Amino acid sequence: MSLTENLEKMLAAGTDNALLRFGLGNAYLHANDPERAVGHLRRAVEHDPGYSAAWKLLGKALEAAEPAQAAQAWRSGIAAAEAKGDKQAAREMQVFLRRLERGAGNG
């Protein structure tokens, strides 16, 4: 049984939390299924709005299809990371956001 199948089985059995949803979102994003990833990552940040890694991955999942929503996810993630003192995560999302904004300016 694959990791994704195991995580889906846990979810079906009633386990639902930020870490499980993050794991599913990450697995679906790596399986090139960003739409499914977005659904799970949104639930992850609903469970834990301070989960900066989930905000970062949500932005990545949204980047191609919904750049404005990706930017908003990264802004939320930057705020969450800064609130926790996670400077590295905040910096990474600031870089992603700047690249996205530069790309939008060129289009």
PLM features: residue spans?
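Structural marker of alpha-solenoid helical repeat scaffolds
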Residues: 13, 46-47, 64, 80-84
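TPR-repeat structural position
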Residues: 34, 67-68, 87
